[in-house]
C-alpha cells in the first residue's frame, strides 16, 4: 500500500496514526519524504522492493523513479485536489490494482469522471460519533469578541486557529493578538518559513503546544488537531469557497 499526501506535516500525522493502529498487527509502516535522511530513504526503498515494508506513506516521493514495489495493491491519494495533473498521473500509473482518491473539495475533472461513471464514487456524509456540527458566524472584526472566543476555548482546555489571507497580514495580526490575549501562547505558520520550521510549528501545535496558531491557509491540508475547536478567519472574503470549506474542516 502506498499513501501519498501533499505536505510533510500530513505525512507525519498519517505515519503516527497508521503505526499506532497497525503496530499489533505486525504490519511495517514506513515514511518517505524530503525529511527522510539518505539512510532512511535507502532502507525504505529496499524494504518496498523486497516486500518487508507493507505500507509506505509519503509525498510525491512514493512515485519516484528509484522506488519499486514488490506487489503494490493499493495507492491512496489524500487531499487529491492539492496534487498537480502530472503528479496524479504518476501515482495512477504505479502499477497498483486499485487507486483510492480522497478529497473534501474534488476538482471539477474528478467530479465529472465520477458522475459519468468513469470512476466509482463514495460519499462520506455521516460525521464521526459525538461530532458536533460546526457553528459558523459572519461578523465584523470585533476585538472583544475575539478575546472572548479565544479565552473561552482556553478555559475548556482547547486550542484555536486564527487565519489570515496573506503573509503580509501576519505581523499586524500577531501584534493585535498579543495585545488582546497576552496570557495565551501564540504560534505561527506560513509558506515563507523553512519547511522544517513549518513542520515543527504545526506538529507541536497538533501535539498540544500553544493556545493559538496564527497561520495563512497553509493549514487547510487536512491537519488533525483534536483539541482545536475555534477558528477565526480574518477577511474571509479574500478566500475562495473551497478554501473556506477546507478550513472549516480543521475544527
Region annotations inferred by a language model:
Residues 1-251:
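Inter-lobe coupling/hinge segments of SF2-like helicase ATPases
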Amino acid at each position: 500500500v502506498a499513501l501519498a499526501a501533499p505536505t510533510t506535516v500530513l505525512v507525519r500525522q498519517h505515519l503516527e496514526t497508521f503505526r499506532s493502529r497497525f503496530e499489533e498487527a505486525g504490519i511495517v509502516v514506513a515514511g518517505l519524504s524530503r525529511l527522510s535522511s539518505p539512510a532512511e530513504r535507502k532502507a525504505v526503498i529496499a524494504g518496498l522492493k523486497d516486500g518487508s515494508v507493507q505500507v509506505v506513506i509519503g509525498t510525491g516521493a512514493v512515485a519516484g523513479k528509484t522506488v519499486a514495489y514488490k506487489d503494490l495493491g493499493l495507492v491512496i491519494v489524500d487531499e487529491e485536489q492539492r496534487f498537480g495533473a502530472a503528479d496524479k498521473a504518476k501515482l495512477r500509473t504505479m502499477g497498483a490494482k486499485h487507486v483510492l482518491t480522497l478529497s473534501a473539495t474534488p476538482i471539477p475533472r474528478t467530479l465529472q469522471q465520477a458522475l459519468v461513471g468513469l470512476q466509482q464514487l463514495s460519499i462520506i456524509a455521516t460525521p464521526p460519533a459525538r461530532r458536533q456540527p460546526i457553528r459558523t458566524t459572519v461578523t465584523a472584526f470585533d476585538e472583544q469578541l475575539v478575546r472572548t472566543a479565544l479565552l473561552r476555548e482556553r478555559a475548556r482546555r482547547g486550542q484555536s486557529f486564527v487565519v489570515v489571507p496573506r503573509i503580509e497580514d501576519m505581523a499586524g495580526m500577531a501584534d493585535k493578538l498579543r495585545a488582546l490575549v497576552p496570557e495565551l501562547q501564540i504560534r505561527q505558520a506560513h509558506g515563507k518559513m523553512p519547511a522544517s520550521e513549518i513542520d515543527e510549528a504545526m506538529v507541536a501545535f497538533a501535539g498540544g503546544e500553544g493556545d493559538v496558531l496564527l497561520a495563512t491557509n497553509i493549514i487547510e491540508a487536512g491537519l488533525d488537531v483534536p483539541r482545536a475547536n475555534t477558528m477565526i478567519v480574518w477577511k474571509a472574503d479574500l478566500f475562495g469557497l473551497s478554501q473556506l470549506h477546507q478550513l472549516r474542516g480543521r475544527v
